[in-house]
Amino acid sequence: MDKQVLLKQELIEDEIQIVTRMKRKVLVKVHLMATVLAVLVISTFFITSLVAELGGDPFFIRSVKRRILYFIPLLVFVMPALAITGNKLARNSTSPQVLKKQRRMKWVGINGLMLVMLAVFLYYRSHYHDIDLVFLLAQLAELVLGFINLLLMVLNARSGLQLSGRLKS
């Protein structure tokens, strides 16, 4: 009877390990998809804003600002998914690389909040006021913060690939 109990306990422990590995695989996939989607959306915002400003066409600038405003809700779902899966994958890790990723993500979050406010302001300013010096200064701030966020996210993606062994240090 003791053998049967031990055997059942071993089977249960094996099943728990399998489920844990499966959960981790799902977390990794969701984290990867959220990373790719976030980088694509943010880089699209950055590039279209830059092209619109360099072109100087007020109609195109307004169009870009409207579309950015429409797509911000996508980031409202993607960025928390990225943070939650990243934190679950990191668990209580003390790895310097994981700690760097977590520090970078805090800055991405802070910059992201400022970028959302700037996007709303730039939409409002481009549609209900002239595209003037105030607009251009806010646009410059948005481009700088957007570039910083892209850089931080690319550095985090590289660190993630190194941690997974898919990229050599």
Where are these predicted regions, by residue range?
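Short, Lys/Arg-rich, polar N-terminal cytosolic tail immediately upstream
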Residues: 11-25
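Polytopic transmembrane helical bundles with strong interfacial aromatic enrichment
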Residues: 22-169
